[in-house]
C-alpha cells in the first residue's frame, strides 16, 4: 500500500500466512509487533496509494474491521449492464475474457485466502463485478505492484484494480477512473487514555514513517492548521523506518500516536484486538483508481461498468465486508492528479 496507495483478509497465523502476507505490517503482540502482523503491515505500507479501511471506528477510536475471509464470488447473479456492454471493443467481446493485474499481498483490499489459491479482498470483488457487468469472464494475474504499469503498457493485462492513486506521472501513461477513497489516519493506544483526537495532537509525539506522505505532507499540514497557526505547540513528528517500528513504540508508550495509511492502521487494530484505536475523522481521504493503458479502447466500457457497480447494492456489500464502508464514492469519474 504505497503511501498513497492511497491498495488489499484475515492475517493467517501460520507459516503459510506469513508468506502470503509478506507485505503488510500488522499484528502487534505487546510489547512488540508479531512477525505476522509486521509482514502484513509492511504490505499495506508498500502499496499503490496509501490505502484506507473505513471500519467502525469512533471519535474515541475502536478498530472493528473485518476478521473473516469472504471467498464467495460476489458477482454471482449480476446481469450484464447493456449500456456498458455496448461500449466494449469488438475484439474484447469476441475474446470473452478480461485480464486484470493485481498484487495479492495487500490485505484487506487485495490478498490470497487461506487456501493460498483464491484471490480475495475488495479489489478482487470489484474486478469480478466489472467483468460481470460486461458479460465477460475474468482472469486474475498476481504480479508485483511495480510491474503493473509496464504490463498494461505492453498489453499483458487489460486493467488493474490496485488501489492506485492518480498522480501526474501516472496519468501520462494510464487512463484512470475513480472507484473508492483511501487516506491517512491516526492510531492511539486502545481506550485512547489521553483522549486525543485527529485535531487535538498539538504538542504530542506522533510517529510517521520516513519519507512517507504522512511525514512530508499531512503531519506538517495538520500541525500548521490546528496548532502553530493558532499559537499552539507544533505536533512533534517522530520519523521511524517502518510502521511496525511506529506501532511498537506506540505500544511501549514512547510516542503518543501513529499517523499512517488508514487501511494498515485499521487492519492492525482488527488483527490485534484491544491494542489500538483508530481515530475519526481521518486526516485526509482521496479517490483511488482503476487503471488501463493510456487511450485504451476498453476504458469507456470499464468506466460505465464501474458506475453501474457503484449504483448497485453490490458496491455497498463489497465495501462493507472488507471494512471500507466509509470510503465509497458516488461517481466513477475520470481521475485527476492527487499529487
Predicted regions and their residues:
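C-terminal motif of bacterial Sec signal peptides marking the signal peptidase cleavage site
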Residues: 39-43
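Extended ligand-binding regions for polar small-molecule ligands
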Residues: 57-82, 132, 192, 199-205, ...
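A ligand-binding cleft/hinge motif common to bilobed small-molecule-binding domains
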Residues: 164-171, 219-220, 251-284
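Bacterial signal peptide processing site
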Residues: 45-48
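Acidic, polar ligand-binding/catalytic clefts
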Residues: 137-200
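Bilobed "Venus flytrap"/periplasmic-binding protein-like clamshell domains
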Residues: 107, 117-133, 164-165, 185-242, ...
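Extracytoplasmic small-molecule ligand-binding "clamshell" domains
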Residues: 53-161
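Periplasmic-binding protein-like
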Residues: 181-188, 266, 270-307, 325-339
Amino acid at each position: 500500500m504505497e503511501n498513497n496507495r492511497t491498495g488489499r483478509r484475515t492475517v493467517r497465523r501460520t507459516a503459510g500466512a506469513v508468506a502470503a502476507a509478506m507485505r503488510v505490517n500488522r499484528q502487534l503482540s505487546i510489547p512488540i509487533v508479531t512477525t505476522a502482523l509486521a509482514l502484513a503491515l509492511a504490505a499495506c505500507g508498500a502499496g499503490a496509494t496509501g490505502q484506507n479501511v473505513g471500519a467502525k471506528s469512533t471519535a474515541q477510536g475502536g478498530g472493528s474491521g473485518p476478521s473473516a475471509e469472504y471467498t464467495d464470488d460476489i458477482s454471482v447473479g449480476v446481469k450484464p449492464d447493456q449500456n456498458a456492454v455496448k461500449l466494449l471493443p469488438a475484439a474484447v467481446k469476441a475474446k470473452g475474457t478480461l485480464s486484470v493485474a493485481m498484487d495479492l499481498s495487500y490485505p484487506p483490499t487485495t490478498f490470497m485466502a487461506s487456501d493460498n489459491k483464491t484471490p480475495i479482498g475488495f479489489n478482487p470483488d470489484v474486478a469480478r463485478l466489472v467483468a460481470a457487468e460486461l458479460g465477460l469472464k475474468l482472469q486474475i494475474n498476481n504480479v508485483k505492484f511495480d510491474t503493473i504499469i509496464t504490463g498494461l503498457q505492453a498489453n499483458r493485462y487489460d486493467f488493474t484494480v490496485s488501489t492506485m492513486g492518480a498522480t501526474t506521472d501516472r496519468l501520462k501513461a494510464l487512463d484512470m477512473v475513480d472507484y473508492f477513497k483511501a487516506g491517512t489516519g491516526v492510531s492511539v493506544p486502545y481506550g485512547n487514555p489521553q483522549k486525543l483526537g485527529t485535531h487535538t495532537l498539538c504538542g504530542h509525539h506522533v510517529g510517521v514513517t520516513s519519507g512517507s506522505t504522512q511525514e512530508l505532507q499531512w503531519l506538517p499540514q495538520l500541525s500548521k492548521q490546528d496548532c502553530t497557526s493558532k499559537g499552539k505547540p507544533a505536533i512533534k513528528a517522530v520519523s521511524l523506518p517502518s510502521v511496525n517500528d511506529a506501532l511498537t513504540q506506540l505500544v511501549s508508550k514512547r510516542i503518543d500516536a501513529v499517523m499512517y495509511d488508514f487501511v494498515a492502521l485499521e487492519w492492525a487494530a482488527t488483527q490485534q484486538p484491544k491494542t489500538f484505536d483508530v481515530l475519526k475523522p481521518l486526516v485526509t481521504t482521496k479517490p483511488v483508481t482503476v487503471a488501463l493503458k493510456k487511450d485504451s479502447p476498453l476504458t469507456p466500457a470499464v468506466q460505465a461498468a464501474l458506475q453501474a457497480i457503484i449504483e448497485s447494492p453490490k458496491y455497498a456489500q463489497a465495501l462493507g465486508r472488507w471494512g471500507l464502508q466509509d470510503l465509497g464514492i458516488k461517481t466513477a469519474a475520470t481521475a485527476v492528479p492527487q499529487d
